């Protein structure tokens, strides 16, 4: 959308904005804008009603608020035009403010928040199905490899998907934000606030652990991961030790990164949006890193996919 379109939408929601600043465009098609009048600012989230609605977001927002979990207050909702207006939490997302000095504190506080989310009542939260988890991994094979890189994966990728499915089925299934990563966590008034929670499902424990501990913008850091898993195990008084939690995280990260590589490639193929292509090499590298050393897919990624991806990005 253009700025004038957003200003016009905000006026239909009883907020007479004089300026609109784009914040981010999500893979789902949601657009977040900061809208400002002479004395206040809000966040306008737009989703074309033909593509979906905000009902899941509103339902989860109410659940979070009812259980004292910090999230953006929804001030206005107009389903006919696909808009919510939310309290502006500022720009201090954890990806932006994260550094060597504060990372341990922020990661521990994020894990505390994750534990609270996992403890929410589950009656209103749908459960991920086996088929959904498998279909998400197939995005990697069918979209990222075949359609985007134009390479036919060898049997090691099918075996990796099968092995991942078997492992994540054996994990504890808990409330899963599904995108519990640093850019979706905002430090506001010294509290970590969670956003973009509309896709919350009951799913494997390792998916959200990998979201916060294996970021798309940094190489895997096993020292930090092991330290934080030890902390998390003690905080939630888990019957699973840090070694078991690492196994959950490993397979959760493999499923998650395969899904995201396919999703981001599809955004470019279907909509010609290239804004996330720069993230693909690190996501692929982290996927390779988390695959067990003796698995043949590791070699396929290293020798075939990584060179093809680098060439593809140079050609775009």
Set out the residue ranges of the language-model regions:
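An alpha-helical support segment within catalytic cores of ATP-dependent transferases
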Residues: 2-11, 122-176, 243
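Hydrophobic packing residues in well-ordered alpha-helices of helical domains and bundles
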Residues: 57, 103-110, 133, 154-161, ...
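Active-site activation/catalytic loop segments of kinase-like enzymes and analogous catalytic loops
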Residues: 138-147, 205-240, 254-271, 283-290
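Conserved N-terminal boundary motif of the eukaryotic protein kinase catalytic domain
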Residues: 16-22
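All-alpha amphipathic helical-bundle segments outside canonical DNA-binding/catalytic cores
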Residues: 126-132, 241-253, 278
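Active-site acidic catalytic loop and adjacent metal/ATP-binding pocket
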Residues: 31-36, 117, 163-209, 219-220
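ATP/Mg2+ or Mg2+-diphosphate-binding catalytic cores
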Residues: 262-316
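ATP-binding pocket architecture of kinase catalytic cores
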Residues: 24, 30-132, 139, 146-148
